[in-house]
Amino acid sequence: MEVQVWLRWYTRILDDFGFDRRADEESASYLDAFLREHGCLRVDDIDVPSSDFIVFGAGPSLRSHLKRFRALDEPMTVISADGATTALLEEDVLPDIIVTDLDGKMEDIIEANRQGAVVVVHAHGNNLPALRRYLPLLQNIIGTTQSIPHGCLHNFGGFTDGDRAVFLAAALGAGRIVLAGMDFGEVVTRYSRPDMDSELGPADPVKRLKLEYASRLIDWLERNGDVRIERW
């Protein structure tokens, strides 16, 4: 997605959610400064084992789709969206790439990163404290912003961790992207909300609107991108 196209989406998102663009850009500036000092990965630095990608979201279908994936006998590039990383590690699946705004179960994201997963860290107006806390614990980081990219930061398109992961796969040259654990419904899991006591719970209105945007953005990519999207 071209930046100018994304910015039209972004303007609507700011209006619908009441987000502060200046806060987004403050967090982005912090992430950029950290990466300039500690190492600035680019897209070309990511080795992908296959042009067939699978993106795991943290929806209710995640566990069943993980079992389906493990039964496959084909190489795929595996991307986990934030909290889905925990479920992958529970099934002994190490993602190649993690896309996160640092509100999943961080000990699992840190462990997967330690084992070799590249972490694509997203800056937005609500996660500056998390950036300060967790960036020093991570390595092999690519930075993203939801505003105008600059310095070490990219903007591939996408709003939530899940659809950003899909847009990242497209930017990495995917020919096929399988969507797994991406339900876009009214139920969330403990992988999406680590503070939740039960396995499943209702999505609040903000979460439902975020998932609606995620679904619409992926639909846009399917219509306009040069990639085949397969929904499990």
UniProtKB/Swiss-Prot annotation:
- Domain of life, per the record? Archaea
Q: What class of enzyme is it?
A: transferase
Query: What's in the keyword line of the UniProt record?
Result: ATP-binding, Kinase, Magnesium, Nucleotide-binding, Transferase
What organism is the protein native to? Methanothermobacter thermautotrophicus (strain ATCC 29096 / DSM 1053 / JCM 10044 / NBRC 100330 / Delta H)
Catalysed reaction, written as an equation: 6-hydroxymethyl-7,8-dihydropterin + ATP = (7,8-dihydropterin-6-yl)methyl diphosphate + AMP + H(+)
Enzyme Commission (EC) number = 2.7.6.3
From the UniProt record, report the name of the gene that encodes this protein. Answer: mptE
Q: What is this protein called?
A: 6-hydroxymethyl-7,8-dihydropterin pyrophosphokinase
**GO process terms (BP):** tetrahydromethanopterin biosynthetic process; thiamine diphosphate biosynthetic process
Q: Which family does it belong to?
A: Belongs to the archaeal 6-HMPDK family.
Main function:
Catalyzes the transfer of diphosphate from ATP to 6-hydroxymethyl-7,8-dihydropterin (6-HMD), leading to 6-hydroxymethyl-7,8-dihydropterin diphosphate (6-HMDP).
| InterPro entries listed in its UniProt record | HMPDK_MptE, MptE-like, TPK_catalytic_sf
